[in-house]
UniProtKB/Swiss-Prot annotation:
Taxonomic superkingdom: Bacteria
Name of the protein in its database record: SPbeta prophage-derived uncharacterized protein YomX
Gene source species: Bacillus subtilis (strain 168)
Length: 216
């Protein structure tokens, strides 16, 4: 006869959680899994289609809880994607929306003067060496439409306006008044929305307006 003397000590919730994690781990080894990098670190995830995205520019990513966060830059199949939604978690994995980054721009920091530790024999002053500013590529989602809150319906932005979604970063050049060029046209950043930033992760929305050339 089977011994049930310790049955009351079994934590059913823990057992279900353990089994669920094992099943998900097996899924990450299956044919639906993808080897990707998230912020430069290799991860194994599952990427699925989003039924409401007919052009395939939006998908879902499923991965281990620590790996999925808003603002993560995902690279796979020679494409760059951005995690744009707050992940949903069920204690086994996280699921979030990703959108393809159709373009990018560069931010270059100011040049710096570095003390070489040497002294000018004539002036007696320290000798400094100029180090060129660091150039940072920022992947982004450039949109001329916006979705209505709580729906997938898209409406056009006011003429000449664009929303540019980027991963969270801190940079001296990222400020209102910045001029960016997309598809041969210049845009000026009029507002910066940090409301989707949580701690060190998230997305920033740049609200930009097309610059009108001066008349001659």
């Amino acid at each position: 006869m089977k011994d049930y003397s310790n049955y009351h000590k079994v934590n059913i919730n823990n057992k279900l959680l353990h089994d669920g994690k094992l099943i998900f781990q097996q899924g990450l080894k299956g044919f639906e899994s993808e080897k990707v990098t998230i912020d430069g670190i290799e991860k194994t995830v599952m990427i699925t289609s989003k039924y409401s995205s007919g052009d395939g520019s939006a998908r879902y990513i499923l991965g281990e809880i620590a790996d999925i966060y808003r603002g993560g830059v995902v690279k796979f199949n020679d494409e760059t994607w951005l995690i744009t939604s707050h992940p949903l978690s069920n204690k086994i994995y996280k699921k979030a929306e990703i959108k393809i980054c159709g373009t990018s721009f560069f931010l270059t920091s100011e040049d710096k003067l570095i003390d070489t530790g040497k002294i000018n024999e004539i002036t007696g002053k320290p000798i400094y060496e100029k180090v060129p500013g660091e150039k940072t590529e920022v992947p982004c989602i450039f949109e001329r439409t916006t979705s209505i809150n709580g729906t997938e319906l898209a409406v056009n932005l006011p003429d000449g306006q664009a929303n540019i979604t980027i991963p969270y970063l801190v940079h001296e050049k990222l400020k209102i008044g910045l001029t960016l060029t997309f598809f041969g046209e210049d845009y000026q950043v009029d507002d910066i929305d940090y409301s989707k930033v949580y701690g060190d992760h998230g997305t920033i929305k740049l609200v930009a307006k097309k610059k009108v050339g001066e008349k001659t």
